[in-house]
């Protein structure tokens, strides 16, 4: 969330950010509720002082009539306090709800747009493969190479679940090991994180849906959710702590990810591209305010290194205002070339990295001491290292050959133990 003083002092900036994101929020209502809350707190303080004064007088040696009068006054004050405290509770709940809706401000270089078509392409890297045969999509390859089974998964678990089989199992594990080893070599602390988080942590990370429907699963009769990303559990790791940020804290977390993906159907969402469960390695960093921009660029550089070493053609996008999540100050996406996408080939999102500044840490009370010994809220940066399902799509579709098999990128062979997946009759 944003600091209330910052909102008051930069009201036009905050309103422009809300409008640029395509959100409809009444920021003046938030200010009104904050003013009302403060007035109620002041009134409650004044009434408590009167009540204490009234109680002190009752300790004195008084005649019966005056004592009865003080008792009646005490009852009136008590009732007034109860009413005001109940009103304060209602106003505070409304205030918190409105406060959580306010998104982060935007970096000055975020493109202003009204759809994903307005995302700005920064560059393209790699050569898109030219086949002298009709390439298959990953669903055909998964069937012909006996790697994927959606039909049995649909019977057992429902739509948008899948079985990985045979070499695809080792390919997923190889991608995880490849990315975790790279991040460890770059100084990241490596974690396997819980797949469940408590509601206040999910809320603190700021997963604000545009509609009323959350994209993650709540566990019935609990305050817990299945995580949609280990950003949630890594980001919550230092909840309510003052941390040492002499150096940035870089973390890499492996987790399963669970998402509802309601309404996600059609050619562009088929197969492994948009599923209810997948595995992912996430990068996360806690740093000082002045370091988050550099860390954000560092995360993008690591993502580019990963896809360059995997030999997958990709492009980098600066994400426009409409396409940003509420916590993000700035976001980059990498989209990989997928020859089977939409029947003719196209780029599909495989990673994102976001600088969330102190938007998340303010909710989660994660602080550090600056050089003057003052508590400051940490800046938090996140980014995908590997989301296995979409990278498997890219590998199968880009490295297929005329014999119907698939070559494994050289950087993965030491992790898979094989360099080729042959066609199976």
Curated annotation (Swiss-Prot):
Catalytic function, reaction form: tRNA(Ser) + L-serine + ATP = L-seryl-tRNA(Ser) + AMP + diphosphate + H(+); tRNA(Sec) + L-serine + ATP = L-seryl-tRNA(Sec) + AMP + diphosphate + H(+)
Domain of life: Bacteria
GO CC terms: cytosol
Residues bound to L-serine: 229-231, 282, 384
Enzyme Commission designation: 6.1.1.11
CDD domains: SerRS_core (cd00770)
Record-listed ATP binding positions: 259-261, 275, 349-352
Transmembrane spans: none
EC class of the enzyme, as a word: ligase
Pathway assigned to this chain's UniProt record: Aminoacyl-tRNA biosynthesis; selenocysteinyl-tRNA(Sec) biosynthesis; L-seryl-tRNA(Sec) from L-serine and tRNA(Sec): step 1/1
Entry-linked PANTHER family: SERYL-TRNA SYNTHETASE (PTHR11778)
Quaternary structure and partners: Homodimer. The tRNA molecule binds across the dimer.
Record-given protein name: Serine--tRNA ligase
């Amino acid at each position: 969330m944003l600091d209330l003083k910052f909102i008051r002092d930069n009201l036009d900036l905050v309103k422009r950010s809300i409008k640029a994101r395509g959100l409809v929020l009444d920021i003046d209502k938030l200010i009104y509720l904050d003013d009302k809350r403060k007035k109620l707190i002041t009134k409650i303080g004044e009434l408590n002082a009167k009540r204490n004064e009234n109680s002190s007088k009752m300790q004195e040696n008084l005649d019966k009539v005056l004592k009865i009068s003080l008792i009646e006054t005490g009852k009136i004050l008590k009732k007034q306090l109860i009413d005001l405290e109940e009103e304060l509770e209602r106003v505070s709940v409304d205030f918190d709800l409105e406060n959580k809706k306010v998104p982060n401000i935007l970096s000055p270089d975020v493109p202003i747009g009204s759809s994903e078509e307005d995302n700005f392409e920064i560059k393209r890297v790699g050569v898109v493969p030219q086949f002298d045969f009709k390439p298959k999509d990953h669903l055909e390859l998964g069937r012909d190479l006996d790697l994927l089974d959606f039909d049995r998964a649909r019977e057992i678990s429902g739509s948008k679940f899948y079985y990985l089989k045979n070499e695809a199992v080792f390919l997923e594990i190889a991608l995880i090991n490849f990315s975790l080893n790279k991040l460890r070599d770059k100084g990241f602390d490596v974690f396997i994180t819980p797949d469940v988080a408590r509601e206040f942590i999910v809320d603190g990370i700021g997963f604000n849906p545009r509609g009323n429907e959350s994209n993650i699963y709540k566990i019935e009769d609990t305050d817990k959710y299945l995580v949609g990303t280990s950003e949630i559990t890594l980001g919550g790791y230092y909840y309510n702590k003052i941390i040492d940020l002499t150096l940035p804290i870089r973390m890499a977390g492996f987790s399963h990810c669970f998402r509802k993906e309601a309404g996600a159907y059609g050619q562009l969402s088929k197969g492994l591209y948009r599923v209810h469960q997948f595995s992912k390695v996430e990068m996360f960093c806690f740093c000082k305010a002045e370091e988050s921009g550099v860390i954000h660029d560092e995360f993008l550089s690591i993502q580019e290194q990963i896809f360059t070493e995997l030999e997958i053609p990709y492009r980098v996008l600066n994400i426009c205002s409409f396409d940003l999540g509420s916590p993000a100050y700035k976001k980059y996406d990498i989209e990989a070339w997928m020859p089977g996408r939409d029947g003719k080939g196209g780029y599909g999102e495989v990673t994102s990295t976001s600088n969330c500044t102190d938007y998340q840490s303010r909710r989660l009370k994660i602080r550090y001491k600056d050089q003057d010994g003052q508590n400051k809220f940490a800046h938090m940066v996140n980014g995908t290292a590997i989301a296995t399902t979409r990278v498997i799509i890219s590998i199968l579709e880009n490295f297929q050959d005329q014999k119907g098999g698939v070559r494994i990128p050289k950087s993965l062979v030491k992790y898979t133990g094989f360099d080729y997946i042959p066609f199976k009759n």
